């Protein structure tokens, strides 16, 4: 097993202007320890700052006009409809393709966009993995192509967390006064629950891989 390892965590829209006050209040001790024992800096972004475009630029080292991912949506196969962006239109290799080509191991979880999962030397769990698209009482079927290798789909499917599984203990740290929110009029708690469930699902898959797979 290679002792020299790199872990890249994508934190969409993270800004030191928001993070520094939280660290100063002692609310992000783990990140604060990483900052104090390492190096930090500000990244220049691209314009317009569209997440799939930026994430693909990071993964490929190319600008959008070269890598081909330009926004949140793309034209469907029929040429008439619009669908959430996938990696189908990416024109160049991502870092995980290059590592596979060189015989190195890599794992990818939830990178945007990474669907359909690519046959890399490792595990890839696409960004279509975490979002619950059905009510809790209906089957939560994983879309084909979400996991590589495909034989691990059932395993990772069992790690997913549905927003309806969250309890008050999960919501209270973010909205202490959540009990007084009129959810009939205000949908922000519902949106927050989806975000927490999505992030927790990605975290569950990522930490399982770190613990059980060579990297």
Label every model-predicted segment.
Residues 1-2, 103:
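Structural core of flavin- and non-heme-iron oxidoreductases
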Residues 3-20, 34, 58, 99, ...:
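Beta-strand elements within well-structured catalytic alpha/beta cores of enzymes
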Residues 10-13, 26, 38, 61, ...:
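Glycine-centered flexibility sites
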Residues 13-14, 24, 39, 45-48, ...:
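An acidic- and aromatic-residue-enriched active-site/binding cleft used to recognize and process polar
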Residues 13-17, 36-41, 50-54, 72-84:
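Glycine-/proline-rich flexible loop or hinge segments
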Residues 15, 30, 50, 65, ...:
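Short phosphate-engaging motifs
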Residues 19-57, 62, 105-107:
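Short, structured active-site-proximal loop/turn typified by the sulfatase FGly-forming signature C/S-X-P-X-R
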Residues 63-215:
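His/Asp/Glu-rich, glycine-adjacent segments
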């Amino acid at each position: 097993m290679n002792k020299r390892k790199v872990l890249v965590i994508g934190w969409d829209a993270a800004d030191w202007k928001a993070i520094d006050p939280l660290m100063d209040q002692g609310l992000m001790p783990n990140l604060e320890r990483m900052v104090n024992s390492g190096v930090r800096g500000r990244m220049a972004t691209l314009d317009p700052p569209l997440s799939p475009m930026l994430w693909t630029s990071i993964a490929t080292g190319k600008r959008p006009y070269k890598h081909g991912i330009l926004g949140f949506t793309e034209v469907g196969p029929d040429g008439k409809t619009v669908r959430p962006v996938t990696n189908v239109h990416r024109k160049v290799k991502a870092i995980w393709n290059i590592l596979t080509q060189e015989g190195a191991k890599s794992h990818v979880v939830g990178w945007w966009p990474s669907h359909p999962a690519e046959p890399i030397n490792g595990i890839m769990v696409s960004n279509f993995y975490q979002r619950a698209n059905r009510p809790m009482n209906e089957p939560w079927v994983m879309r084909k192509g979400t996991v590589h290798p495909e034989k691990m789909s059932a395993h990772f499917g069992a790690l997913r967390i549905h927003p309806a599984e969250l309890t008050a203990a999960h919501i209270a740290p973010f909205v202490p006064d959540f009990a007084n929110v009129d959810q009939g009029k205000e949908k922000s708690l519902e949106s927050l629950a989806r975000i927490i469930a999505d992030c927790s699902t990605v975290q569950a898959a990522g930490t399982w891989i770190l613990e059980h797979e060579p990297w």
